[in-house]
């Protein structure tokens, strides 16, 4: 259960989570692939979510991802990001890591209302390279 008290978080707390979904256009934005690989290099289970993607390599939505996701890494425009936040609320996904350019005041407010912990930062900066 997500509670309103969980509405803020720091990146180091989220980076300890083991199961991630990276939401972005994996075919058009090379940073999305870099984020996925960086998380995997740290032993994370990472699901690729791309509304324009092609299964089975990518899931169309968070609802299609098997199992429980602990953290979503958001790498889409803020308008699409609002849809992702709504899916997170419906699925009970408690953590949102927002990459530069993907955030908005609306996303922050909606996360707070849903009790989703939100951190704005960059996985590539906050998670060192070359772990495994």
Question: Where in this protein do the model-derived segments appear?
Answer:
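A short acidic, amphipathic alpha-helical/loop segment
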Residues: 34-35, 83-88, 107-110
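Rossmann-fold NAD(P)-binding glycine/threonine-rich loop
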Residues: 100-127
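Mobile, glycine- and charge-enriched loop segments
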Residues: 45-46, 52-54, 58-77, 118
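Mid-chain, well-packed structural core segment of small domains
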Residues: 62-102
